Amino acid sequence: MAKDDVIEVEGTVIETLPNAMFRVELENGHTVLAHVSGKIRMHFIRILPGDKVTVELSPYDLTRGRITYRYK
């Protein structure tokens, strides 16, 4: 997936799922299934329910995404 093809949106983590997956509610009300990007996993950044995050969505599958940033 090329970097210029992604759609970046903000959302809130609703629940934590197994295998580092999260259910995220976007600002527009949609719910997506998101996994953690490699840099966040590498630096052991914890993501908990209620955290505000930035999610990258592929234009081909808008139900899945990648968490790229957790706001402080």
Curated annotation (Swiss-Prot):
Subcellular location as annotated: Cytoplasm
Family annotation (SMART domains): S1 (SM00316)
Gene3D superfamilies: Nucleic acid-binding proteins
Pfam family, one: eIF-1a
Main location per the UniProt record: cytoplasm
Domain S1-like residues, every copy: 1-72
UniProt entry keywords in alphabetical sequence: Cytoplasm, Initiation factor, Phosphoprotein, Protein biosynthesis, RNA-binding, rRNA-binding
Entry's Gene Ontology molecular function annotations: ribosome binding; rRNA binding; translation initiation factor activity
InterPro entries assigned: NA-bd_OB-fold, RNA-binding_domain_S1_IF1, S1_domain, TIF_IF1
Modification sites for Phosphotyrosine: 60
HAMAP family named in the record: IF_1
Protein name: Translation initiation factor IF-1
Species the sequence originates in: Geobacillus thermodenitrificans (strain NG80-2)
Lineage: Bacteria, Bacillati, Bacillota, Bacilli, Bacillales
